[in-house]
């Protein structure tokens, strides 16, 4: 998951998505180990079902850093829903609607799996953008997903990392981070915690 400030802003909003699972919302109830394992990424060579655990409706809590890579510590928060649907054989699309102190977010995530490279491409967009972002590309290892892209932000070449972690049967965490030093250090700027809505 940048060539203009508007595109950067859209990517920030897209992660976790959310981009997109945050720091503080634990699952309200613990599920059985079998249930947890059935929703966790498969971790097999054919990873087209790595995101199957994410299919469903989620409560989403999102935190966005207003001014990344400036030393700022001003965050805004949003609450809403993320509805993730399966498409084709393993791909999926998520629609996020959330409201917060900085207004309303209407976001979309598209995740496509390449069976030749065994990699995922994660795309983001929002209701005002009218286009998909360049993809963040990567995969899952040991229950964590990391996806990378090189972009331009405020005239500087940066690395973008979109991560998926803390995956349980009914909760997960997404994080977008930027690096301005080639990946030596990372600053998180979009953090999302999601909790599965049970029928």
Question: Which positions does each model-derived feature cover?
Answer:
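Bacterial N-terminal signal peptides that target proteins for export
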Residues: 2-13
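Glycine-centered signal
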Residues: 1, 20, 24-26
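Hydrophobic small-molecule pocket/channel-lining residues, especially in calycin-type beta-barrels
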Residues: 27-199
